[in-house]
């Protein structure tokens, strides 16, 4: 485990100790807060480079999983050992989220702890794999706009109705997770606990986290996600971004990557049931989707890709084709 020179060290070690995890190895070079982040180019658990020291220690200790929390301990990155090759495989936020979600739903169902009318909350750009998983367990799936504050808002709504226990779990693709209604934001300490508990559950069955993910893919379908972005610098760039979004609304593509567009959802209208937002979603006949939105913090247009197929390779190929098509659409010319 590495707190990436941030605040996660003490609370993470404490919670794992209280849960009985005895073989926890903390990266010594990144154990204590360091405002200069001397050992890191960028202290972000989404960046593979941030795991350099942790992966080195993991190989030395033959660890099963590798965890990194960001400096303010609200996001969690995960690597898991491939027992066939001995290498460590990076989990996306979607992979970690759906694995933990399915484990929580499985255990609550098995122990009779599932509340009435349970709900799981994700964002509109998070993996579609949550749909068949929640359907399998009879759990309502609530999709909200991008940003964990909207997941927290749903907890508030349930609390206002007098039923906060209905909230089971929430996550977003950008490495944010939360179980329970104790806070209103993503919580990496909570997520570490859930990841380790999930890993222990599968280890007791002789499975690694990677084995578990692949088993879920085989059961529910190979859902794969990808993210691309296009940068537009300066004031002219902002105008160009606005023009691109306007152009998409007036002349939406009929096909993307050779697949017919079955439905277009414009979140900047009143018909979605969500607050209006500058987001466009293209749902294709093959179950894939492409979403386009301007970044709220950078001069970028982000493109979210999601595909499902009968193999990982086939789903990745669809996403690659959609990414190539996005570059050619009249909306995005760099």
PLM feature segments, named:
Residues 12, 74-93, 130:
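Short Gly/Thr/Asp-enriched flexible loops that form oxyanion-binding sites at enzyme active sites
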Residues 1-21, 28-30:
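Active-site pocket-lining segments that scaffold enzyme catalytic pockets across diverse folds
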Residues 59, 63-65, 87-89, 107-293, ...:
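Phosphate-binding and adjacent anionic-ligand microenvironments
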Residues 3-9, 73-75, 125-128, 235, ...:
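Gly/Ser/Thr-rich loops at beta-strand to alpha-helix junctions
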